[in-house]
Amino acid sequence: MNIDLNADLGEGCASDSELLTLVSSANIACGFHAGDAQTMLTCVREALKNGVAIGAHPSFPDRDNFGRTAMVLPPETVYAQTLYQIGALGAIVQAQGGVMRHVKPHGMLYNQAAKDPHLAQAIAKAVHDYDPSLILVGLAGSELIRAGERHRLVTRQEVFADRGYQADGSLVPRMQPGALIHDEEQALAQTLDMVQAGRVKSVTGVWTTVTAQTVCIHGDGEYALAFARRLRAAFNARNIHVIA
């Protein structure tokens, strides 16, 4: 079987270049929560060198809190901001002779769009209007995935190696206990369950069905690089091929 392995990059982490040798897709910060024109250019060049699929990682305008602040913005504003960020990265990718493949929202924009159909609609419309061939990445089973499908976009349902899940398939909010998985063995077991069995055990002990088409490794995690190597080895041992 095949699985896509993605990481959020261009966010100021020293491990970006090494992670790009292990993942199949890169979600590059577009300046609203982290990064700038230079980091975008650097990440694009490194991704192209390693044959990694390139995607935009748009966010709410929130550099002070790394895009993790909840915001209530009109859908038209979210549409414009998303389009702006996709376009910025797209210009850099095109100038370097590459092709942008996907869009994955960041942080609170991602989380709110997973539940808010109006926000999800604004993001999906921005992606479609920029380039309807782009893939929209969102939380498995979320409103964002449904919005992408309504716009006839190709979607990729995402699961997280290092995040706790609630019984409804949503992520445990970062400020709550169980939101982050720090134990590598637990994260590895959870990932294999999601990829191979299509299920995840919630923090309440309930097993929930989940569709895993792409697995996220957070590039800003303390052990991201070591865990990425372990996960690749585990996939190889089970004849799971990492491919975008």
Swiss-Prot record:
Membership in a protein family: Belongs to the LamB/PxpA family.
Catalytic EC class: hydrolase
Enzyme Commission (EC) number: 3.5.2.9
GO BP field: carbohydrate metabolic process
UniProt keyword list: ATP-binding, Hydrolase, Nucleotide-binding
Source organism (scientific name): Salmonella typhimurium (strain LT2 / SGSC1412 / ATCC 700720)
Subunit record text: Forms a complex composed of PxpA, PxpB and PxpC.
Pfam annotation, one family: LamB_YcsF
InterPro entries given in the database record: Glyco_hydro/deAcase_b/a-brl (IPR011330), LamB/YcsF/PxpA-like (IPR005501)
Protein name, UniProt field: 5-oxoprolinase subunit A
Source organism superkingdom: Bacteria
Role description: Catalyzes the cleavage of 5-oxoproline to form L-glutamate coupled to the hydrolysis of ATP to ADP and inorganic phosphate.
Catalytic reaction list: 5-oxo-L-proline + ATP + 2 H2O = L-glutamate + ADP + phosphate + H(+)
